[in-house]
Each structure stands twice: as structure tokens, then as C-alpha cells.
């Protein structure tokens, strides 16, 4: 039995979707549970050459043997949830998903408030998905819960009970975190942050398990960190420099161009300490050095690629166990058992 939490080590967009999908296929967890804020964070999952952009359904959906869960701590937009369940019909998501009946519900009024609030939309760079205003209502105890919404009633249940029972039965459980540690309401670059905490301890609470149940925390870092929206970015490079390096990306939810920077070892060390990270996953190593593209054996990485990994391990103090060298699941180096 292993309970693994995957967290973003930067400002989101680290490539958690790819790492989560790989772990779900490799480790075959019985439950893949989603923690985090809500539908304000997007993940892109590629299956057999087809890309799926999702915001509510856990990114481990390609593993058709696993139950998919959305924890009580996750804000749920029924419209987005139902749309994604239909989009992923061939993966039988509708029969496998369990949404906690205590989850908070995002309504149209929350989205309208999010988009019309000048402070949120212009100064902070909110995604406009209604999460901030919904969390305000939750704090005021006026927010609807999943049990109050008929359209999703057939998907509702007790996620905490399901996850704890799976762990007690000796099954593997994977908990997906969203966004990134540096967007945490408590530990990020306030006020340019999201509307709740985005670290491992909070993700565990989101799905209803205690801290002693957690075995592994995988912190995901992109070789070139990116950020959408406003806020400090200590190692940010110019847009022209990013273009020269071939690093041009756009946000899954907002469509806005991502700001790009160089790897920040000091911030990475703080993030790993904050999350109690037991291992690191590095994504987009092929963007750092194109000679690393598609490599699946660590020893066959270029010297430049190996030097990057070694520097991360030495300066951050946590072992790099997973390395993504391309968008496909098989384009992954896994040294967890070495």
C-alpha cells in the first residue's frame, strides 16, 4: 500500500498531468483522487496521440481500472464536470467518478463576479472561473454543496471514506494536486496567489485523509518554469529570449501566453521543504536540451541533461526519480527503484 501525492513545485503548468498519467499507468492505483482549488487549473493529457484538456476530472482517467474521485475540498462546477464526463465517455469516466457530496459548488454568479472584479481580473490575473468568489461564500457558509445539486447527484458519495478504505485494504492511492506551491494563498507571492493553499498537506485534507497516511510526495518542476498572470518571477527571461530558446507556451484554461524563466534552485528547495517532498520529477528536459528528447534510459542522456539533474539534486537536496523527455507517457525515465 502506498499513498502518493503529486504537487506542483512552481506556479502551475509544470507538466503534472504527464507525470500523474505515467504514475497511474505504472503504479496502477485503485483510486485517483483530485485535491486542489477547483476548475481554475487545467491539465493536458495525451492518449494515443489525442490531447484532452480537462479541469475537473482527475488526470489519471486513462487508467480505466481506477476509481476517480473529486474531494470535498475541491470546488466543483457542475457544467464543466458534466461536459468532461461526456467528452471522456470512451474512458467510462461516468461509471467510475465519485464526487464528494460536501464539495462546494460554483454557480454562474461566482464566475460573473470573478470576471467583473477589476482587482481579481486585472491586478491579480484571475482565471475567471469563479473559484475565488465561491470560496468567499464557503467561508461565509452560504455556498451550495454537491448534495444540493440534482444534475450531479448520481456521481456523489463519500470520497474520504472511499480513499481510507482503499488504503486500509492495502491498495495504492494517488492524490493529484493542482496549480503550484508558489500560488498558495498562505505561502505564495501574496496577493498574486490563488484562493486557498496548494501544498501537499492541504491536498490530503481535500480528499479526507490524515498526514500519517501519506507515504510519498512527488514535487514536479519544469526545466524552464512558467507563470500565467501577474506577480513576482525572480528568474524571468524576456519574451524574445524565450522565443529564441523555443519555449513558447499558452495556459490551458486562460489561453494567455505564459511567462518563462530559468530554474530557481533556491525556490525549489523551499518548496520541497514546505511539502515534505520525498522525490522530484523534472519535466520538459527536452526543452532544456533537445538531445534529451525521447530518451528513456538515464545513462543515455546528454552530459548537459545529466548535469542539470545533478545540480538540482545537489542544490535542492531531494533525489530526482522521474524525468520527462517528451509529451508521450513512454518518454519518461523512472529511477525510483534504482
From Swiss-Prot:
List of residues binding GTP: 12-18, 42-44, 258, 284-286, 324-326
Catalyses which reaction(s): IMP + L-aspartate + GTP = N(6)-(1,2-dicarboxyethyl)-AMP + GDP + phosphate + 2 H(+)
Cofactor(s) annotated in UniProt: Mg(2+)
Record's cofactor remark: Binds 1 Mg(2+) ion per subunit.
UniProt binding sites for IMP: 13-16, 40-43, 127, 141, 179, 194, 256
PROSITE patterns associated with the record: ADENYLOSUCCIN_SYN_1
Primary location recorded for the protein, binned into one broad class: cytoplasm
UniProt pathway annotation: Purine metabolism; AMP biosynthesis via de novo pathway; AMP from IMP: step 1/2
Annotated Pfam families: Adenylsucc_synt (PF00709)
MF annotations from Gene Ontology: adenylosuccinate synthase activity; GTP binding; magnesium ion binding
First-tier enzyme category under EC: ligase
The protein's Enzyme Commission number: 6.3.4.4
Keywords: Cytoplasm, GTP-binding, Ligase, Magnesium, Metal-binding, Nucleotide-binding, Purine biosynthesis
Record's subunit section: Homodimer.
The protein's name: Adenylosuccinate synthetase
Organism (species): Methanococcus maripaludis (strain DSM 14266 / JCM 13030 / NBRC 101832 / S2 / LL)
Amino acid at each position: 500500500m502506498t499513498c502518493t501525492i503529486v504537487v506542483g513545485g512552481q506556479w502551475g503548468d509544470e507538466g503534472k498531468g504527464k507525470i500523474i498519467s505515467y504514475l497511474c499507468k505504472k503504479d496502477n492505483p485503485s483510486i485517483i483522487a483530485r485535491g486542489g482549488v477547483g476548475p481554475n487549473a487545467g491539465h493536458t493529457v495525451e492518449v494515443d496521440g489525442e490531447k484532452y484538456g480537462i479541469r475537473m476530472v482527475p488526470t489519471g482517467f486513462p487508467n480505466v481500472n481506477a476509481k476517480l474521485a473529486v474531494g470535498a475540498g475541491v470546488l466543483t462546477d457542475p457544467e464543466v464536470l458534466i461536459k468532461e464526463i461526456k467528452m471522456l465517455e470512451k474512458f467510462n469516466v461516468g461509471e467510475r467518478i465519485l464526487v464528494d457530496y460536501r464539495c462546494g459548488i460554483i454557480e454562474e454568479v461566482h464566475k460573473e463576479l470573478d470576471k467583473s472584479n477589476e482587482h481579481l481580473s486585472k491586478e491579480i490575473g484571475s482565471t475567471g472561473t469563479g473559484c475565488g468568489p465561491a470560496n468567499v461564500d464557503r467561508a461565509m457558509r452560504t455556498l451550495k454543496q454537491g448534495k444540493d445539486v440534482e444534475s450531479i447527484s448520481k456521481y456523489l458519495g463519500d470520497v474520504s471514506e472511499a480513499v481510507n478504505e482503499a488504503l486500509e485494504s492495502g491498495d495504492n492511492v494517488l492524490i493529484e494536486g493542482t496549480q503550484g506551491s508558489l500560488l498558495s494563498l498562505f505561502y505564495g507571492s501574496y496577493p498574486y496567489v490563488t484562493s486557498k493553499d496548494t501544498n501537499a498537506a492541504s491536498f490530503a485534507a481535500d480528499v479526507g485523509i490524515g498526514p500519517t497516511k501519506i507515504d510519498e510526495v512527488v514535487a514536479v518542476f519544469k526545466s524552464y518554469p512558467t507563470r500565467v498572470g501577474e506577480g513576482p518571477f525572480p528568474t524571468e527571461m524576456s519574451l524574445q529570449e524565450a522565443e529564441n530558446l523555443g519555449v513558447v507556451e499558452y495556459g490551458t484554461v486562460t489561453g494567455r501566453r505564459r511567462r518563462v524563466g530559468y530554474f530557481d534552485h533556491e525556490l525549489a528547495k523551499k518548496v520541497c521543504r514546505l511539502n515534505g517532498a520525498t522525490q522530484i520529477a523534472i519535466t520538459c528536459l527536452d526543452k532544456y536540451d533537445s538531445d534529451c528528447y525521447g530518451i528513456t534510459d538515464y545513462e543515455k542522456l546528454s552530459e548537459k541533461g545529466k548535469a542539470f539533474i545533478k545540480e538540482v539534486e545537489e542544490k535542492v537536496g531531494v533525489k530526482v526519480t522521474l524525468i520527462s523527455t517528451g509529451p508521450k507517457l513512454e518518454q519518461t525515465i523512472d529511477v525510483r527503484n534504482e
